[in-house]
Each structure stands twice: as structure tokens, then as C-alpha cells.
């Protein structure tokens, strides 16, 4: 049985790691195409975002603005988390909202774990209880390539 934890480890964590390495190793202004690839924002979308915001180059701050506005799964998670000011403790409702998961599987996972709130460190336990088939996320047996 594949779980949301499998998806998170294969799809989201490598993307976060690649962004972290990029931001630590590259100096702004950042290359627009690389940023688009990292955030999985199609070129037409990021070009439109840059034009709407009248941005000619990407700094660290603009990188995160683009991340909030992008439509990729990670961008959506980032946007929803920042809307909630990156909570220290997560209720099932907050987990479902941030990670775009159906509420019932998250509530079931919380009941199975006997917890009402979760720290960042506890999220993998919650994710491991949510069957991927219950989510909207596809799973590929081919690992994500790290850019």
C-alpha cells in the first residue's frame, strides 16, 4: 500500500532539498528558467507572474513571492502554510488544508495515532497512515530527478 508519506518522500522532499541547495549555493539574481524548473512552474506561468508583478530579475524575496503564487503542489503547500504563519502544532484540519488532503483520512490517522495535534516531527507518522489512493496525488515508481 502506497501512502502519502511515500509520495512526500519521493516527490516533495527532493524538491525541497533541491530548492535549499539552490538558494544556499546560487547568488541572486536567479535564472528565471532554473527557478521555474525548481518550482515546477511552466515557463508561460512564471513569465506571466513576472510580467504582472513588473519583475525583471529574481531575488531571494521574489523567489518566495513566486513560490506563493505558483500552481505546483509544493507551491500550493507553501502558500497555504504561510497563510497560517507556519504553525508549530498541526491539527488534522490544518494538515488537510496545508497538504491538500481529504479531511477524513487525516482525522482517521490522528485517531489511529491517538493524538489531536502534531509537531513537524510527527507529520511523517500521520502521512504514513494516509493511503495515497485516498488523495489526489499520483505516484510514480520512477524517483524524481534532483536538479
Give residue spans per PLM region.
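DNA-contacting interfaces and partner/effector-binding or oligomerization modules
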Residues: 1-11
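Short alpha-helical "recognition helix" segments of helix-turn-helix
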Residues: 34-36, 95-96
